[in-house]
Amino acid sequence: MMPEFEKNTVHIRDPERVEQIICGLIKGGASKLQIITDFDMTLSRFAVNGKRCPSCHNIIDNSKLVTDDCRKKLVHLKETYYPIEIDPHLTMEEKYPFMVEWYFKSHTLLVEQRLEKDKLPEAVRESDVSLKEGYEQFFDRLHQHSVPVFIFSAGLGDVLEEIIRQAGVYHPNVKVVSNFMDFDDNGVLKGFKGELIHVYNKHDGALRNTEYFKQLKDNGNIILLGDSLGDLTMADGVPNVENILKIGYLNDKVEELLEKYMDSYNIVLARDETLEVPNSILQKIL
């Protein structure tokens, strides 16, 4: 096993299986590999020095692009629905309608605010968003070896792209699928494009992107990164999986959810704000 796996944040149910998968990934090398990853709290940090970091949605919620009244409503929605999202006693099916409701209500509020497209870069710059330690190495190495990276996010695509653009890691090998804003000719938000992506319907989104995955039919080796049990379905659109390594970041309710995560993810990283483990695996493969 690798020294990075000795960290106390790392939890592995079946070390032999993990070793087997990693050997398969190493054997396939760069030409067979693709990355499928969530964004909020997976590539970005959950907290810095105990202070929560914003998601793509939170960046807008906390910015001066929305009125205080709107902010209060958005915070109220978060206080109502976030506990449902992470409730260990509810199934994904039970959570599903609540997530749709949350997104629909918050997106409606954002449209009412008539957000302006050209103000987004400033909102990102002024926010406390922070990518996980080791992000440059992660993105740059994948770019260097032309490994496709599919970022699949239930967040706000325009904000997400701006974050990775400002971080200097929006390389040509990166494709973002997310909730993209629809602006009118004056650059004012009028709605959202396409089907809603929320935490628990990524399976449907994955199937809508089969064209992308078909083009990568030789890339049967996958590293999947997520932070929610809903993220496990992100590779459902991949036609021919040979080896898949599922790495899960567990950020909240660690004690209650650890067993569940260990049943589903090959490697669980509890309260880990770094990309150390994925980077060490990529170093072996590439």
Curated annotation (Swiss-Prot):
EC number(s) from the headed UniProt entry = 3.1.3.5
Provide the catalytic activity annotation: a ribonucleoside 5'-phosphate + H2O = a ribonucleoside + phosphate
- Under which main EC class is this enzyme filed? hydrolase
Alphabetically list the UniProt keywords. Cytoplasm, Hydrolase, Magnesium, Metal-binding, Nucleotide metabolism, Nucleotide-binding, Transferase
| Active site per UniProt | D38, D40
Q: Which residues bind substrate?
A: E85, S106, S153, A154, K202
**Entry keyword annotation includes Nucleotide-binding:** yes
Which positions form S-S bridges?
none
Coiled-coil parts of chain: none
- Pfam families per UniProt: UMPH-1
- Which InterPro entries does the record cross-reference, listed alphabetically? HAD-like_sf, HAD_sf, Pyrimidine_nucleotidase_eu
Query: Which SUPFAM superfamilies does this chain map to?
Result: HAD-like
Q: Which GO terms describe its molecular function?
A: 5'-nucleotidase activity; magnesium ion binding; nucleotide binding; transferase activity
| Residues involved in Mg(2+) binding | D38, D40, D227
The cellular location(s) given in this protein's UniProt record come to:
Cytoplasm
Tell me the superkingdom of the source. Eukaryota
**Alphabetical GO biological process terms:** nucleotide metabolic process
* Keyword Membrane annotated: no
Q: Which PANTHER family match?
A: 5'-NUCLEOTIDASE, CYTOSOLIC 5'-NUCLEOTIDASE 3A
Function according to Swiss-Prot or TrEMBL: Can act both as nucleotidase and as phosphotransferase.
The text of the family note is: Belongs to the pyrimidine 5'-nucleotidase family.
Name of the protein in question = Cytosolic 5'-nucleotidase 3
| The species this protein was found in | Danio rerio
Q: What's the name of its gene?
A: nt5c3
